[in-house]
Amino acid sequence: MLMLFHKSAGQNITVRVNSVNDKKEKVVYATTAILRNTDSSLIFTQTSNKETVFLLKNNTAYILKITAVNIKTFYQKLFTGSNDTTINVVLQTVSKQLGEVVVNSRTPLLKQEDDKTVVDAEQLAGSSTNAFEVLEKTPGAIVDQDGNVYLNSSTPSTIYISGREIKLSAQDLANLLKNLPANSISKIEILRNPSAKYDAASSGGIINIVLKKGVKLGVNGSVDVSHFQGVYGSEAIGFNVSNSKEKLNTYLSYNFSKKLNGEDLSSNRYTNTGGLFKQYAFTRFNNTNNYVGGGINYDVNKKLNIAYDVRISATQNNSDVNNNISISSLRTGNILGKNISIVNNEGPSLYVGNGVAVKYKLDTLGSEWSNTLDYTYFRSNSNQDYSNVNIFPARNTLLGDGNILNNKNILAYKSDVVLKTKKKFTIEIGTKLTYSLSKNNSVYFSDTSTGKYVDRLQTNRFRYTENIAATYLQIAKTFGGFTIKPGVRLEYTDIKGRQLIPADTTFAIKRTDLFPYIFIRHKIAKIFGFSLVGNAIYRRSITRPFYESLNPYQRYADQYTYDIGNPRLQPQFTTNYELNVNADEFPVFSIGLNDIKNIFTTLTYSRGDTLFRTYDNLGTNKEIYMRAVIGIPPGKKYFFYAVTQMNIMNYKGQYDGVPFTFHKSSFTFFLFQNYKPTKTLTLSLNSFMRVNTVINFFELKPYGGISFSGNKSILNKKMNVILTVNDILRTNKNSFVINQPNFVADGYRFYDNRRIGIALKYNFGLKPRAEKRQGFEIPQEIN
């Protein structure tokens, strides 16, 4: 224990730490950390080749921790006295060869950090081919087949990639995630109740997919090859590489993938006139994608850091739909009509996201000023051909084609200042400006016996701009076992939309809203060695109508189904209240209420023989949720965690102009198990089940899935062979029922989810030596 001399209470002193190895050589890139003596939680950390300097409170007990490659982790009690001091540490060298890793560590799979849950995505990536599948296996995240991801409520969450919001439709976002390689993800951060620092338009919470970047350990990387086979197959090949010098860190990743998949959709729709519409549609998807990600990170000096990163995803999309429809009388059973609709869509899409980040350290207390400027570009160009063959009664075949062009440009600037005072106040203040421009141009033609003509019903040109200016302030202070963090966010919204074709129509939304936030933490007790901490959260948020939900043009699905936006859609507001308990940074239990007003969602309206899928405001929903997490801390060979969540929904409002109430309780179960029979073999089993699920008022019958993964290290742990089986029992199928005013239907929807796959991963260069950690953690293979 290091004893320093007493000076006077309530002041800070400077502590300098120098470290060398047992050969008296300077340790390269040593990470020096200051931990709390009471619970070993992290206070400060620095990685440097030189002397590290900390400003610490005098007459206080801490823990000093130092880690580095090929160095045994160093721990020592530290008690600050009254005078500045310098600590010289000799670290013990551990003999290793380049490219080898001794796996004697435990990497946390699931842990709580303040107001966010952090999931180690690398544990899930081994049994996944893309980011979408990783999200499906993420504990507490509920993914529907349209690509929406849910956390606490019936409102979809907002998706971020490396801290940048992805402003795409659910379908475009799902396509982007399905083309993002699973092995490019480092971790997933789940913010169920984001603070005032984050955009208020995140009523459903935030999921931040953090991509891998280079680490300061010289040259290292991996090469990956995989093939998955179900009814259809998919394959991918790619690499990740990073290179670091003393101040410069660069990284690059590339992935090529080709995916084939199929979807079965069967539905029965019952009309008010006693008719039955039976529909069976099969869709075959064939997509190829090239993904490139890279970045550069430069330490100008000890205080200033500049970084640039870019992500490019280029996809060739192809789909073929074969839709069989029959119309009959429920009373007599007579066939009234029968036809086949064939639709082909093909075309490229391009996503480019890039940004510059500048971070400046203001002092040694941890204060900093960060600025980011991001530009996102998305373009899709789809050509569609369709034909409607009327079998009974026999009529002329209807032929048509169209071109759908979408362009999005998003520019965002954000500035954040974090001030940490000597009296242990943390003050955060910042601003964000976002400009978004979206353009849609759809041109359709109908082929008739007399020629080819413009289809004025489907042809559309639409322009949409969105300007959002925001500023926030929040303050955090810990005293007497309590941490209190109140905050407030002010946002100004200016939205304009103009349809030029088929008719010149405009709409505009201008509004200013205030969003308060309160976070209170209190240490409850210590039971069986676990420190229990309770949190209370209050938050107000908004869900704004987005471009696709407002665009009034009719998009053709088949001759009986159209997708159409609603330019009269109004924002939805959510007030959230939550109490939760954590045990040693592990989430244990949560209970909360989402009070949602002016709710809007996807709805299906029936107009005679035609269905319109649109968006509309319904009324209110008071949703109660409860979530519990249990697990066995990892021993030498076995670990598991289980998550149970219950949602109780109470809707009240109008559906298609008819008053309605809707009450439903749904349950979700997750289970992850990991078994390590040898030092080089890890087996994992991931399963989930959902009961009484409701999505956009479609009530789903119980469904779920079981996935297995085996990970074997070979070639002195330089290569991993991963065998995966997804949806073993083929139970991940949605059977649905909807019974609402003017719309009654049932059916099922099924993807080619059951797949067996093999992946090879070769690791090269210098890898970080993992550390031994405590709590709810899982053994990790080399990655």
Residues covered by each model-derived region:
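Outer membrane beta-barrel strand-and-loop segments of large Gram-negative receptors
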Residues: Y280, I410-K414, D455-N460, Q570, ...
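Short, acidic, small-residue-rich periplasmic hinge/interaction motif at the N-terminus
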Residues: K23, T31-L35, K65-I71, T86-A125, ...
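Short acidic/polar hinge/loop motifs at secondary-structure boundaries
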Residues: L55, A131, K137, R164-R192
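Outer-membrane beta-barrel signature, preferentially recognizing the C-terminal barrel domain
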Residues: N406, N460-E466, I542-D595, R613-I624, ...
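Surface-exposed extracellular loop regions of Gram-negative outer-membrane beta-barrel proteins
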Residues: V210-V223, N261-R269, K278-Q279, N287-G295, D494-K496, I527-N576, I591-D609, I728-P741, ...
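N-terminal periplasmic accessory domains that precede
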Residues: D84-V90, A131-V134, L173-L176, I190, ...
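Face-selective signature of the C-terminal outer-membrane beta-barrel domain
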Residues: Y291-T315, V343-R498, A525-S531, F586-I591, ...
